[in-house]
Design a protein with these regions (language model features):
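Generic protein-terminus/edge-of-domain signal
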Residues: 1-55
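Short acidic-glycine-tyrosine-enriched beta hairpin
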Residues: 32, 62-77
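Short histidine-centered beta-strand/loop micro-motifs
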Residues: 36-43, 83-86, 103-106, 133
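A short beta-strand-loop-beta hairpin characteristic of the jelly-roll/cupin
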Residues: 49-68
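Ligand-binding loop in jelly-roll beta-barrel domains
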Residues: 64, 78-108
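Aromatic/histidine-rich interaction motifs
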Residues: 105-118, 123
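Basic, amphipathic alpha-helical hairpins
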Residues: 124-132, 146-155, 161, 169-177
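All-alpha amphipathic helical-bundle segments outside canonical DNA-binding/catalytic cores
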Residues: 133-140, 160
Length: 177
């Protein structure tokens, strides 16, 4: 891991139960302030970031993704990224273990979040990260995965240039718009 990238579970203790859970899918609710920045980090699990209010901008090596409240940002496991908050985002995050992420996107993308998926995400944040197979929680999480699989990827992505000089200029603009 690049020393500039943090193990997010170490720097944000509320994430540790989700990063290390036995359950294949967990969810977490976190509210942020306008302008708050989550520094570059990565997760062991894939992640669907969804703001029920506010807007998020995710920056990764391959580009920048923007998600208003009717959109979510899918990040594959291990993808280094940072997040900038706009407004006062009420973020709901779904974490998916690699073993459960089959048939889910293998690249970062913005997904549509319809009414059913939205309510499933919100309900999933009320399920403890140590839920057991076979009950209501398992059925809810299975349906949540099914709905994520069905949502289309949307073109809300700004690719980063490959040419080093242009990339350096773009990074400067992003740091100080």
């Amino acid at each position: 891991m690049n020393p500039l990238e943090k193990d997010i579970a170490e720097s944000k203790p509320q994430l540790a139960p989700h990063e290390h859970a036995r359950a294949p899918v967990t969810a977490l609710a976190v509210d942020y302030r306008d302008g708050e920045h989550v520094p570059r980090h990565r997760h062991r699990r894939a992640q669907l970031l969804y703001a029920i209010e506010g807007v998020m901008t995710v920056q990764a090596e391959a580009g920048i993704w923007v998600a208003p409240p009717t959109r979510g940002i899918w990040l594959p496991a291990g993808m280094a990224h940072s997040i900038r908050m706009h407004g006062q985002p009420r973020v709901r995050t779904v974490f998916v273990a690699p073993r459960a992420a089959g048939h889910l996107p293998d690249r970062c993308c913005v997904l549509a979040v319809g009414p059913l998926l939205r309510e499933l995400i919100v309900a999933a944040t009320r399920v403890p990260p140590d839920w057991r197979p076979g009950g209501r929680d398992a059925r809810l999480m299975a349906l949540l995965l099914d709905e994520i699989r069905l949502e289309p990827a949307l073109p809300l992505h700004l690719p980063q240039p490959d040419e080093p000089r242009v990339a350096r200029v773009c990074r400067g603009i992003l740091r100080e718009p």
